[in-house]
Amino acid sequence: MLVPRKLKWRKPQRGRMKGRAKGGTEVQFGEYGLQALEPAWITNRQIEAARIAMTRKIRRGGKVWINIFPHKPVTKKPAETRMGSGKGSPEEYVAVVKPGRVMFEMSGVGEELAREAMRLAAQKLPIKTRFLVRGGGS
């Protein structure tokens, strides 16, 4: 599970997901990538589930890069608690993903296998995605 070592703030505000991703919009490390088409909070559990789905599909061949990290803590109040009495305690960590961000990359496998592995990973995520090939289009 991906969890930040140290936080600047324990309970940050939620913020807004305006606009498109500034950086990380192209395949940098591998040959193939999985790009987000919608804005969302991706939890550390979803990232881990997608990673496991990809690595199981490609078995021992290939290498996988995870380009997003869940830096943002999300708080939650306990069940059946009255309103007020402060903000809830941090429950999970999320990565803020904007449209255009390449979340996962892969190399060392064929395009068909990479496409299938990325499809399995995309099913674990709550957003629409697309498959990218380095240097080319989708």
Swiss-Prot record:
The keyword rRNA-binding applies. One of its GO terms (biological process) is translation. PROSITE patterns: RIBOSOMAL_L16_1. One of its GO terms (molecular function) is rRNA binding. CDD domains: Ribosomal_L16_L10e. GO terms for cellular component: cytosolic large ribosomal subunit. The keyword Flavoprotein does not apply. Signal peptide: none annotated. Keywords: Ribonucleoprotein, Ribosomal protein, RNA-binding, rRNA-binding, tRNA-binding. NCBIfam families: rplP_bact. Part of the 50S ribosomal subunit. Binds 23S rRNA and is also seen to make contacts with the A and possibly P site tRNAs. Belongs to the universal ribosomal protein uL16 family. This is Large ribosomal subunit protein uL16. It comes from Rubrobacter xylanophilus (strain DSM 9941 / JCM 11954 / NBRC 16129 / PRD-1). The gene is rplP.
